[in-house]
């Protein structure tokens, strides 16, 4: 496909989220989010991708999945459940001549374990050992705040990571709150903090760290990066006067690396509580 034909093909797709460099001066027309992505890349630099198996959750157009391959990953599995992004991903994979990145479609972040079991069974056969169904790195990027149950997703991510594997997470964060809080954005269209119908929760930094620790992760604090990423904010006309204090929060973005740990790395009471499946249904303890 020549450059002009490729540009026509790209522009025929109704929506692009990522700006993916396809070579020969062609970049997909994604959103202007370079400060956000570059902040994430600086945190990602702390992870060695060479020879690793990588899971990219909710990959969308696949930018960070393809970048993982470029960084030396031996295999990348990209998952998503948005139909409109599937064609974009497959086109980019074709143009980039990607051989190590696979798209596994119709995978919710809430059922990674079950859906990936199908993937591994179909792709590798049923005799595959349990430990091989896990990943060295899980990329959980721009996702946490979109989820009604964010901790369930973190537990699912931990369940498919090897011990000492790395979780790369990027999310909205409250920049100016030192207490552990998880701010509720309100029912869709209320937009207390973010004028985005898909945003449910925004954690403070300490809350994010505690959520990760409660999902069997150790925070690599030296990798943490944050900045005030300005997004269009909704006027507070729909918020009552008693809720005006909500404006005090500065919403930004952060990225951090966390390492997968075992129950034995926690104190006894915490390990006992976290391991109860009826309390923590997202964590599949038989895989740990």
Q: What role is predicted for each listed range?
A:
Residues 64, 143, 153:
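Conserved sugar-transfer catalytic core signal across GT-A, GT-B, and GT-C glycosyltransferases
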Residues 82, 144, 173:
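Catalytic metal-binding/acid-base residues of hydrolase active sites
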Residues 54, 138, 143:
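Receiver (REC) domain switch-region micro-motif
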Residues 1-133, 251-288:
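Conserved N-terminal segment of class I S-adenosyl-L-methionine
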Residues 62, 66, 146, 169:
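Short, electropositive, low-hydrophobicity segments enriched in small/polar residues
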Residues 15-16, 89, 141, 200-202:
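Tryptophan-centered motif/residue detector
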Residues 27, 45, 129, 141-144, ...:
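Short N-terminal micro-motifs specific to bacterial/archaeal maturation
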Residues 111, 121-125, 135, 139-140, ...:
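S-adenosyl-L-methionine-dependent methyltransferase catalytic module, highlighting the catalytic core
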